C-alpha cells in the first residue's frame, strides 16, 4: 500500500539536543514539484494541509492544488485550514462563551454528550476591552478606572471565570494586564509550536485565528493569523476547520529606510492607503525586499496590525534574524529561539536576502519617500500629509450634515473656576492608545521625549483636551519610567489610565460637562487625535465628528496645539515662557535620541511583567465561582442571557425557505462598517437599548457600553443599526438608526420597525454599497440582523470577515452585478423582494432577485451568490455554522 504525502514527508530535526518530528516541505516537494518560490505565507498553509491530510477534509488533491498555485499565482480551490490556537478578547469572548454554554444546553436537550462542547485547541482570552477612561489627567486615574471597571463588569468577569473552569484548554488573561494583540506578540506567540503526540515531539508553525480583526498583528512575528467572527472561532476551537479559498498573495516590496523624523505610524498609514487603492480584500499580503533588513519587528507588527484597514486577510512578514532578535528581547527561551530558526530554515520559511517569491501582483515603496502623516477624518485609508490637515479638516466640516461651519463661533465655558473659549476644530481628545503603536518602543519613546522638550520650554496641554496614556502592556510603563520620561508625560496630562484598548475602541469615557455643553451649544465640529487603528464615525465619542490617526508624538503635539486648524508643519505649536513661538521641529526628538531611549528596553522587563500573566489583581482573585458544566442563568441579568439561537433547533435541518415579499429595512451607502451595524460604544438613554435597560431597573450611569453587554441578546438586537452616525437613505437627512415601516411609511427606530415586521411575518432585507461590513470582526453585526429577521443582504461588495459571519448566522449575502447599484436601479426602499429556489443554491451562482416596486412594476436583477465554498453552503443550509457543529456532535 502506497504511503500518503503526509507519511512520506515526515522528518526530524535537532534543536538544543532535542529531536523534533515535522512534516517536511522539501520532502513533499519531491512529489509536488519545485515550491521554492511559493510565498512564505502559503508555505505555512501548505504545511498545515500536509500535517492534517486525512483523505477526507484534506486530500492529496488539495495539497497539489496549493503547490500548483505557482503556475498562475492563483488557484480556485477550497481548502480546510486548522489553526493551532484561538485568541479572544472579552467583548467578543463573552458572547462566544455564552454561545458555548448555550450549545451545551442544546446538546443536552437533544440527547447528546455535553462534554463534546469543549475546545480541542488552546484558547487564550485576554480581558482588554472593558476599561474606560472615566478619570484622566492625574496620578489616581489608573486606580479609579480599574475600580470602576471591576465594579461595572463584575457579572461578566464571574461568567468568564466560570468558563475558565468549565471548558478545557481555555485560559483567561485578567483585566489590567494588557491588550490581547500586544500580549500575543510579546508573550503568547511562539512562531513555531511544539507538542507531544504519541511519545514524539511534533514541531509545526504557530498559527491562529482570533475574534478580533487586529489579530493580524502577530504576522509581524512570522505567525500566520487573522481575525474571524466569534461564531467561526467557536467552530474552529471545537474542531471544525476554517473553510477558505486558496488566497491570492500580493507582494509588497519595501526598500530604503525611513528618513529622520518619520515614524512607523507614518509608514503604516502610507502602506494602508496604497493597499486599499490596490484592492486586497480576501487576499494575503506578504512583505519582502531589502528594506526588511533594517525594519524593526515592532514596526513590522504595526504594519501587520492594520491589515483590516487595508482590507487584506493578513500582512505577513517571514521569519528572519530580526524575528529572532525580538524573541530574545521579549524573553522567549533560547531553546524556543533555536527551534524557530532551525525549523524555518529547514522548511524554506526563512527570509533570505534577495528572496523574490512569485506573487499574484506586487507593489513597491521606497521608505525614504514616506512623509509625516495623519489619517482621517473618518477612514483609516484616508491619509493626509501633516501640512494638509487643516485643509482636510475644513473640507470635512463643510460636508457635515446640517453644517453651518461659517457661523460657528468659539463658545465660552467655565471649568475649574477659569473661563475659556472652545473653538470649532478643537482637539478635545488626545489619546496614546492601541496595540498598533503602544507595542512600538520607538514611537512611545518619541512621545516621551517630545513631552520632555515641551515641558522644558514651558508648553502646556490646552485645557479642553482630554489626554490619556493606555499602553498595551505593563512593559511600556517600565521602559518609560526607566528612560525617566513618565514625569513629562504626566505633566502634560498623559497619565496612565489603564492597560487596555480604551479610546481606540470607543471607551474614551465622557468629556467634562462644560466641554460637552459647549460642543452641543453651537454644534461644533471637534476632533480626536489618537494613536489607534480605526477612526470611523461615532466610534471614538458620540460628540466628536472627526477622528484622526497619528503617531504618539503627534498625539502629544496636537494636545499642545489643541486645534485641527493649525498647520503643525509651519505654524507655532505654542509659546515658551518668554512668549517666543515654538514650532514642532523645535521639540521633535532626533533619531539618535530615540535610539538611546529605546536601549532602555530590556529582556528583564518582559520576563518580570509576564511571569504571572494569568494571575490578576487581588480583586480578580477574589471572584469566586461554583464549578459546574452548565451555567446557572439568571433571569434578571442584564449582562448574561441564554441566547435564543438554538431554541427551535432540531437534530435535522429543515429545507431553506424561499424569500417572499421581503421588505427593505435599511438602504445604506459605501463603507458601512460593523461599527455602524453593531456599535460598541455608549448606549443612549432614549435608544431602544437604553429604554430596555431602564425598564429592567438599570440606571443611566450603569448602562456601560454595547460591547460590554454582548452577552445579552436583548440589548444587542436593540442596538443593531443604532450607531448615531449611520445614514439610512430611506429617511434622507436623518442620522441614527431610523427607518420607514412600510407600507404606512411611519418613521420609527430600526428595531421597532423590525419587531412590527416580525409580527406581520414579513422577511427583511438590507441594501448597501461597496465594502459592506468593513472594520471590526464582531459577530453581533450578523447576529443582530438575524434576530431582527433579516434574511438577505444585497451589496456592491462585502468585507471578508463580515461576509463569512452573515453565512455563519444563516443570512444570504448577495452582490449586485458589476455596474449595477441601488442608485442605477433607482431604489427607494419601498420595493418588495422575492428570491426563489434557495434549496438549490450553489456557491458563486447567479441568483435572480425580483424587485416589485410600489407601482406594481417588476424587475429581475441577476445577483451573485457570495456563499463562496461548498462548506459555507452547508453552514447556510444548516441555518448557521454552530447549528452544523451541534448536529455533528449528535451523530
From Swiss-Prot:
Cofactors, names only: [4Fe-4S] cluster
Q: In the UniProt record for this chain, what is stated about the effect of gene disruption? A: Cells lacking this gene are more sensitive to peroxide stress. The acnAB double mutant does not grow on unsupplemented glucose minimal medium and does not respond under aerobic conditions to glutamate. The acnAB double mutant retains a low but significant aconitase activity.
UniProt key word Iron-sulfur? yes
| Short name of any one Pfam family annotated for the protein | Aconitase_C
Sequence positions that bind [4Fe-4S] cluster: 435, 501, 504
For this UniProt entry, the molecular function terms from Gene Ontology, in alphabetical order, are:
4 iron, 4 sulfur cluster binding; aconitate hydratase activity; iron ion binding; iron-responsive element binding; metal ion binding; mRNA 3'-UTR binding; mRNA binding
Protein's pathway: Carbohydrate metabolism; tricarboxylic acid cycle; isocitrate from oxaloacetate: step 2/2
User: What's an example GO cellular component term for this entry?
Assistant: cytoplasm
GO terms (BP aspect): anaerobic respiration; glyoxylate cycle; response to oxidative stress; tricarboxylic acid cycle
The answer, when asked if Membrane is one of the entry's keywords, is no
Q: Which UniProt keywords apply?
A: 4Fe-4S, Iron, Iron-sulfur, Lyase, Metal-binding, RNA-binding, Tricarboxylic acid cycle
Q: How does activity depend on pH?
A: Optimum pH is 7.4. It retains a high specific activity over a broad pH range.
What upregulates this protein? Induced upon entry into stationary phase by iron, oxidative and salt stress under aerobic conditions. AcnA is subject to CRP-mediated catabolite repression and ArcA-mediated anaerobic repression. AcnA is negatively regulated by ryhB RNA.
Reactions the enzyme catalyzes: citrate = D-threo-isocitrate
Q: What is its EC number?
A: 4.2.1.3
Describe how the cofactor binds.
Binds 1 [4Fe-4S] cluster per subunit.
Q: Which family does it belong to?
A: Belongs to the aconitase/IPM isomerase family.
Assembly notes: Monomer.
What is noted besides the main data? Answer: The AcnA activity over a broad pH range might be a useful adaptation for specifically expression in the stationary phase, where the intracellular pH may vary over a wider range. AcnA is resistant to oxidation in vivo.
Function, in words: Catalyzes the reversible isomerization of citrate to isocitrate via cis-aconitate. The apo form of AcnA functions as a RNA-binding regulatory protein which plays a role as a maintenance or survival enzyme during nutritional or oxidative stress. During oxidative stress inactive AcnA apo-enzyme without iron sulfur clusters binds the acnA mRNA 3' UTRs (untranslated regions), stabilizes acnA mRNA and increases AcnA synthesis, thus mediating a post-transcriptional positive autoregulatory switch. AcnA also enhances the stability of the sodA transcript.
What's the protein here called?
Answer: Aconitate hydratase A
What species does this protein belong to?
A: Escherichia coli (strain K12)
Q: Encoded by which gene? A: acnA
